[in-house]
């Protein structure tokens, strides 16, 4: 199941009827359909599998003792139907450009957004950060080197995850399992 168990959903609804000041902590090993939870929560913390010190770490986040700096390693779907069963697509060489954005998907939902509720790499903080002077170069070792400056623009101490992604536009090799 990609939703919360019915008992937990019922408990959440009872709490939501009494207050709108809700911070939801989700402890799960996979992305869930959290749309209803997200709509009624001031914040959602994806704690995943936090381990033995998880309660203390989560408490520090909720009370502002520690500044959150994590980013999602998966997308949180808008609805269960957005979760693919498999992803075996081969890159076709049809590069996504500003001219063909509408044709990126061959089928789409008509009644909900075609985007996730929270995308891969999403994460909030109690402060802001500015990433500047980004420099990308290929080294003599044939590795890509990325350098940048990160500045905290807020009043709260924090750490930022600098996200850098690479994708080939054409697959030259089809790997078989």
Model-derived features with residue positions:
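C-terminal non-catalytic regions of proteins with extracellular/luminal or membrane-system context
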Residues: 1-176
């Amino acid at each position: 199941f990609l939703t919360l168990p019915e008992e937990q959903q019922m408990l959440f609804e009872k709490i939501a009827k009494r207050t709108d000041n809700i911070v939801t902590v989700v402890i799960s090993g996979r992305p869930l359909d959290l749309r209803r939870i997200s709509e009624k929560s001031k914040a959602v913390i994806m704690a995943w599998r936090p381990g033995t010190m998880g309660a203390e770490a989560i408490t520090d986040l909720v009370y502002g003792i520690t500044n959150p700096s994590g980013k999602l390693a998966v997308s949180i779907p808008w609805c269960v139907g957005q979760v693919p069963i498999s992803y075996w697509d081969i890159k076709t060489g049809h590069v996504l450009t500003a001219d063909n954005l509408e044709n990126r998907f061959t089928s789409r939902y008509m009644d909900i957004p075609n985007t996730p509720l929270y995308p891969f790499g999403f994460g909030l903080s109690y402060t802001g950060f500015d990433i500047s002077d980004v420099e990308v170069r290929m080294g003599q070792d044939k590795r890509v080197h990325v350098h940048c400056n990160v500045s905290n623009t807020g009043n709260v101490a924090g750490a930022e995850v600098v996200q850098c992604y690479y994708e080939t536009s054409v697959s030259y090799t089809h790997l078989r399992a």
